[in-house]
């Protein structure tokens, strides 16, 4: 971006907040309020004010709510959170925030009395996604535009479904994450994101991890989230902090989304 008449380059920042239960696995017959979300709500509103004052621009947050079979089975309604925290969602809408979906693939197995992330069953995955979009549109009177699948899980079939359902932005991909196992029970495999793109892109229809050309790309955008290894050398982190501080002296973000 060129600088004219003292104008400075502006850096948009997208920051995601997942609205979900405190525990990944819990007793579905004794569901609890989501205390983490409750505790973070007011501080984030103070942050909104501070960020707006610091940048001279409105700060809009990006919220991704759990609407999926685990919530339905445990709380009696897949969209329970929107009812339970209705004042918060009303405030998000008034503030012009983005609200999207963050479903997980948990399935309750009663004989074993345990939750299983059933990534290996594509029909179940599509049920989780479809359920979320259906309830979202009913509650907000519009299609869901933004999406983040739980546990960074994604595949081409699901991206095709997201596009068909009207999603415009997917924020699932975590670049650098290797194919690994969860600590809880699951089926299937998690994606390998070691070679994933780190900048927003429209994916190729045949491979959601590849940038598509003009003739084969999807309408949907992938926005990979920022990732870093906790094993980075401290001296490297120090150099990054210094470089960032120098950079920020001449740049300020226009819009901040948490």
Per-range role (PLM):
Residues 25-28, 72-77, 110-112, 156-161, ...:
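A short acidic (Asp/Glu
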Residues 2, 149-258:
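Active-site-adjacent pocket scaffolds in enzyme catalytic domains
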Residues 59-61, 65-153, 218:
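Metal-dependent polysaccharide deacetylase catalytic core of the NodB/CE4 family, i.e.
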Residues 2-91, 95:
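Active-site beta->alpha N-cap acidic-glycine motif
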Residues 23-35, 117, 241-256:
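A solvent-exposed, charged loop/short amphipathic helix patch at secondary-structure junctions
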Residues 10-16, 60, 96, 144, ...:
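Extracellular structured ligand-interaction cores
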Residues 14-24, 63-68, 101-109, 223-228, ...:
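Short loop/turn segments at strand-loop or loop-helix junctions that form parts
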Residues 38-49, 86, 90, 126, ...:
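Amphipathic, non-transmembrane alpha-helical secondary structure
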């Amino acid at each position: 971006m060129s600088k004219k008449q003292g104008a400075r380059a502006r850096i948009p920042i997208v920051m995601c907040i997942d609205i979900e239960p405190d525990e990944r696995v819990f007793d579905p017959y004794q569901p609890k309020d989501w205390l983490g979300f409750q505790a973070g709500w007011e501080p984030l509103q103070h942050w909104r004010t501070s960020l707006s004052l610091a940048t001279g621009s409105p700060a809009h947050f990006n919220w991704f709510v759990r609407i999926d079979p685990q919530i339905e089975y445990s709380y009696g309604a897949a969209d329970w959170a929107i009812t339970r925290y209705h004042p918060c969602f009303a405030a998000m809408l008034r503030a012009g925030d983005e609200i999207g979906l963050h479903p997980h693939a948990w399935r309750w197995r009663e004989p074993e009395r345990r939750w299983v992330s059933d990534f290996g069953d594509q029909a179940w995955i599509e049920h989780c996604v479809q359920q979320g979009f259906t309830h979202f549109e009913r509650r907000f009177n519009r299609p869901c535009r933004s999406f983040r699948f739980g546990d960074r899980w994604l595949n081409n079939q699901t991206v095709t479904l997201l596009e068909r359902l009207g999603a415009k932005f997917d924020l699932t991909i975590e670049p650098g994450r290797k194919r690994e196992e969860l600590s809880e029970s699951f089926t299937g495999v998690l994606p390998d994101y070691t070679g994933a793109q780190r900048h927003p892109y429209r994916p190729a229809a045949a491979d959601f991890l590849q940038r598509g050309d003009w003739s084969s790309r999807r309408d949907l955008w992938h926005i990979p989230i920022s990732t870093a290894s906790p094993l980075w050398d401290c001296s490297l982190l120090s150099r990054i902090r210094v470089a960032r501080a120098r950079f920020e002296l001449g740049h300020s973000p226009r819009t901040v989304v948490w």
